[in-house]
A protein has these predicted regions:
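Catalytic-core signal marking the mid-to-C-terminal active-site face
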Residues: 171-264
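Phosphate-binding chemistry for phosphorylated carbohydrates and sugar-nucleotides
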Residues: 1-171, 178, 184
Length: 264
């Protein structure tokens, strides 16, 4: 992206300011890119730009920041794309593919828009597998991996940025309005260290099952709980979403403590 982004945006007629474009072989993702959008958020809050986009080291991910300085994550971007593609007749099955870690707010948005949210395990390979199997055109992850199967079978951050600019141009709406259609539900994600054997033991524990049921009852139908083993790291991931930020923090900490107690 360092070598192509400036030329790409220039060809499209965009006035672009390129930041963090001096790689030295060791500074990839260092306080920049899609994992560090804080600087972009503060810059956008000054009101000089219409949007900002941030790529990761290999530019297969893209996150955005709207004109007010609010971060727009992958779920929100997929929501924007799916809604526009449906309006244009480019959304086979009126469906978008996301993962189990996608925001509760995305699923609410999809129901309201008449879009079927197809769910897979975490990982863009599972998203693509589902898209290929069912003939769907859009899918991705909250992290900013987004696949436009009409164009290519993998995530491409620059393509995501172009598509976002296209929707803004076509609708005449600022990014804050486009992204604001998807409700943001508070989310707490905690990690618990665990090896493979411990991961399996967790799913067989009646104590954890009882604790999860208790927490789900307190949460009601305004949120959800997801406890899963990481596919890439020796971790158990505890995710709780809901409208009450204090409650979901309390429940997430209780569930994480329950995991730690069981795994000792």
């Amino acid at each position: 992206a360092v070598r192509t982004a400036e030329e790409l945006f220039s060809l499209l007629g965009a006035e672009a300011t390129i930041l963090c474009d001096a790689p030295d072989g060791t500074n990839i993702n260092r306080e920049c890119g899609s994992t560090h959008v804080e600087h972009l958020a503060s810059l956008m809050a000054e009101g000089k730009y219409d949007l900002a986009v941030a790529f990761d080291g290999d530019a297969d991910r893209c996150l955005a920041v709207d004109e007010k300085g609010h971060v727009v994550n992958g779920d929100q971007m997929i929501a924007i794309f799916a809604r526009q593609m449906k309006a244009e007749g480019r959304l086979p099955g009126d469906a978008a593919v996301v993962t189990v870690m996608s925001s509760f707010g995305f699923f609410r948005f999809a129901r309201e828009q008449g879009i079927h949210a197809e769910t897979t395990k975490v990982g863009d390979r599972y998203v693509l597998e589902n898209m290929r199997k069912n003939g769907y055109n859009i899918g991705g992850e909250q992290s900013g991996h987004i696949i436009f199967r009409e164009y290519m079978p993998t995530g491409d951050g620059e393509l995501s940025a172009i598509q976002l600019m296209r929707v803004m141009k076509k609708t005449g709406e600022p990014l804050s309005v486009l992204a604001g259609r998807m409700p943001i539900t508070p989310q707490v994600l905690l990690n618990v260290a665990a090896d493979r054997d411990m991961k399996e033991a967790l799913h067989e524990s009646p104590e954890m099952e009882a604790l999860i049921e208790e927490c789900e009852e307190r949460l009601g139908d305004t949120g959800r709980i997801l406890i899963r083993a990481s596919g890439t790291e020796p971790l158990i991931r505890v995710m709780v979403e809901g409208e009450d930020a204090a409650l979901i923090r309390e429940l997430a900490e209780r569930l994480a403590a329950g995991c730690e107690k069981l795994l000792k």
